[in-house]
Amino acid sequence: KSQIQFHNGVTSKEIQETLIKAAADLISAETPNYQYVGGRLINYALRKEVYGGFEPWHIKKLVEKNTVAGFYDAELITKYTDEEWNKINTFIKHDRDDELTYVAMEQLRGKYLCQNRVSGEIFETPQMCYILIAASLFQDYPIETRLQWVKEYYDAISLHDISLPTPVMAGV
């Protein structure tokens, strides 16, 4: 059993991290579904950190914010029109994050999601990471076909039909 302890003045972030650790401690051969509980708890923590709440932002808002902060290439925002960003936003299936296990979410938030490596602040969620990899890869493809490529590639990587090497995932 997990032993959760709180103290006066504990922050909501500390409570969330305690719950994540408690879920991870409960993962076993007899109770394997706690791997999904832990993954979802990490997802909720990420959403609060990135969006300030549970509801994801429009993709263009996230790209603009992270471009201004210096974490995304400034050229990306100009490669797509507002109409294309709106279409790309419809491709994103944020509920796919609910299928990620504790270990997968820890890998993503520890190694692959865009973050400040000094402060540890994270600037995107897994589905935003996946769609932005696709949008970056196909930004110079012909306008007539590139959104279809973005959608198909996003679906393939976000559904884990294909896996990406670390340099691509880490934004190298």
Which sequence ranges carry the predicted segments?
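Extended catalytic cores of very large enzyme megasubunits
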Residues: 1-172
